[in-house]
Regions:
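Conserved short loop/turn motifs at secondary-structure junctions
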Residues: 47-50, 79-87, 109-118, 141, ...
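Short, Lys/Arg-enriched N-terminal segments with co-localized hydrophobic residues
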Residues: 2-14
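Active-site cores that bind ATP or allylic diphosphates and position pyrophosphate for catalysis
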Residues: 82-84, 90, 112, 126-289, ...
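Secondary-structure transition/capping motifs at alpha-helix termini
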Residues: 35-39, 67-75, 99-109, 234-235, ...
Length: 571
């Protein structure tokens, strides 16, 4: 009996702990399940508008919706809210699909709001017949003026109570293209004194004589976002419509529209909002991102300094690192500023696990091993990734003349300098122990060549007594004879302040970092020729890099993803 009681207590404790670990959206879903929603009725969607490239802010919505789909084994639709033909293009549809797939998620169906244009139109006609919508012939500026403000009641349109037959006739003629853009609109008849401005007879349709990327010139009128969005959710039977906090005030309108078409027995979708993700030193306004491109601050949507998913991918961020970042940020109800250092931390943490280790010298100086036979070369074995047991090894060439980093040598240095100096020893990574002997300088006194000797019995991994000898420093190198030239692009923050668009009266372009990119020429081991574009790499002792799409057979370009180390630790 005692065992049963203890088991029940333990079970309750575990259930309470599980409940505490749920975020507020998961708790809403669990409550809905407890109140009769069937598990097989759970369905989500990610509904981007195809008018630009996805950015870091979208990754949160993607991860939340698809993550919930995985948690509840529920389908997630990728639905394009393509209701504005002025700004939407197939190029953006393709890039969005690529980004979602790259992040590691799979949708159930690809759908479009334009799939539902006829149904939305039919429902709008139904609302007109019921006296809940009317055609307004006033310009948009007048409509805006009549809405007033939250503390002042709005003014009703003189067309608000026109006969239903008139509105039906005009709406059909709007659809047929008989009227000019801006001359008429269809408005819902709700409440012109509501403190919620969205409820003051919102526009449902406007005239737009622009070709649509999917429907061509079939339609001359297009539904507004608020009308199309919730009804699309209803058509697809989305159980939980999740969006950012900016749409919280739109929820009453979302529900009002839904109430007009809802049929008993169907799933009644509910909108819930979560905090948007703002990351320091980044902007996500599409208009401002377009300005960066138009004014040649950056080189396109996939510039590695851009906060777009395509830019982050090109810079070398991994899908796992972004998903982990979103997981650490969590799902909150209040907006706050996320430190970019947390994103870098997640990227660095993942790259440490998966990046292949390679050798490259980004500020080269020649090193000649005087007692190594001229013309001789050998191939040495070195590990690909000590963090992965099955990563294996590779062969790298070694010869008499090498390149090392300029900062890895000093003619004279104290006891705390554990790199190469005259009279001092250092190990060449995966190779031999060498000793600095002398230098050669140009007419300006700059060192051009370092001369050293090597201990031929000290080869790494050979098992000799000399190879086991301990020296305090190990440096990387590349064989001068075999090295390939590499162009290294080091990226810094695009802006000099945490919130570049925080001040409304100051142009955000004033905060552009003039040193957001620097390009240097170096040398890399020959295997870098065959590295795939986008493959994560660690340039040993330097940082994490990836091969860029600008690479050619004669010019190998590598983007720095993040530095090797940082003092930042998440709280």
């Amino acid at each position: 009996m005692q065992i049963v009681v203890l088991f029940d207590i333990l079970k309750r404790i575990l259930m309470e702990e599980e409940k505490k670990s749920l975020n507020f959206i998961e708790q809403i879903i669990e409550d809905d399940l407890a109140n009769g929603l069937k598990r097989e009725q759970i369905r989500f969607r990610f509904p981007p508008e195809p008018n630009g490239y996805l950015h870091v802010g979208h990754t949160k919505a993607i991860c939340i919706n698809f993550g919930l789909g995985e948690k509840y084994n529920a389908p997630v639709n990728l639905r394009f809210d393509d209701t504005n033909p002025e700004k939407e293009e197939q190029e953006f549809v393709d890039s969005i699909m690529k980004d979602v797939e790259w992040l590691g998620f799979k949708w159930d169906k690809v759908l479009y709001a334009s799939d539902y244009f006829q149904q939305l139109y039919d429902w709008a006609v139904q609302l007109i017949k019921e006296g809940k919508a009317y055609v307004d012939e006033q310009p948009s500026e007048v409509i805006t003026e009549q809405r007033k403000n939250p503390t002042e009641p709005g003014i009703e349109s003189p067309f608000r109570n026109r006969p239903v037959e008139e509105s039906l006739d005009l709406f059909e003629r709007m659809k047929n293209g008989e009227f000019e853009e801006g001359s008429m609109s269809l408005r819902a008849k709700i409440d012109m004194v509501s403190p919620n401005m969205n409820m003051r007879d919102p526009v449902m349709y406007r005239i737009l004589k622009r070709p649509h990327h999917r429907t061509g010139t079939t339609w001359k009128i297009y539904p507004m976002y608020d009308w199309a969005h919730g009804e699309s959710d209803y058509i697809e039977q989305i159980s939980h419509s999740l969006c950012s906090l900016e749409f919280e005030n739109h929820r009453p309108l979302y529900n009002w529209y839904l109430d007009q078409v809802y049929e008993e027995g169907r799933v009644k979708n509910k909108q819930r909002e979560f905090a948007r993700m703002n990351v320091s030193y980044m902007i996500t306004s599409k208009r401002k991102l377009q300005r960066l491109i138009a004014e040649n601050v950056v080189n396109g949507w996939d510039d590695p300094r851009m906060p777009t998913i395509s830019g982050m991918r090109r810079k070398g961020y991994t899908p796992a690192s972004i998903r982990n970042f979103i997981d650490k940020v969590g799902v909150a109800k209040r907006e706050n500023l996320i430190e970019i250092q947390l994103l870098d931390f997640c990227v660095r943490e993942d790259l440490n696990k998966v990046a292949k280790r390679v050798m490259a010298v980004v500020d080269p100086i020649k090193l000649v091993i005087e007692n190594y036979p001229e013309g001789q070369e050998e191939w040495l074995e070195t590990e690909n990734n000590p963090e992965q047991e099955n990563a294996g090894t590779r062969q790298i060439p070694f010869s008499r003349e090498l390149y090392i980093e300029r900062e890895d040598f000093k003619e004279e240095a104290g006891n705390k300098f554990f790199r190469l100096k005259l009279g001092g020893e250092v190990r060449l990574k995966s190779a031999y122990i060498i000793k600095g002997e002398r230098v050669e300088k140009d007419e300006n006194g700059e060192i051009t060549t370092i001369y050293a000797t090597y201990d031929e019995k000290s080869k790494s991994g050979s098992g000799t007594e000399e190879s086991l000898r301990k020296v305090k420093g190990t440096i990387h190198w590349v064989s001068a004879k075999h090295a390939i030239p590499v162009e290294v692009r080091n990226y810094e923050k695009l802006f000099t302040v945490e919130q570049p668009d925080a001040e409304k009266d100051v142009d955000f372009l004033n905060f552009i970092n003039p040193e957001s990119i620097s390009t240097i020429q170096g040398f890399g081991e020959p295997g870098l020729k065959d590295v795939a574009v986008g493959e994560p790499l660690q340039f040993q002792r330097i940082g994490y890099f990836t091969k860029d799409q600008d690479s050619t057979d004669t010019n190998y370009v590598f983007n720095r993803t993040v530095t090797l180390k940082d003092s930042y630790k998440p709280e």
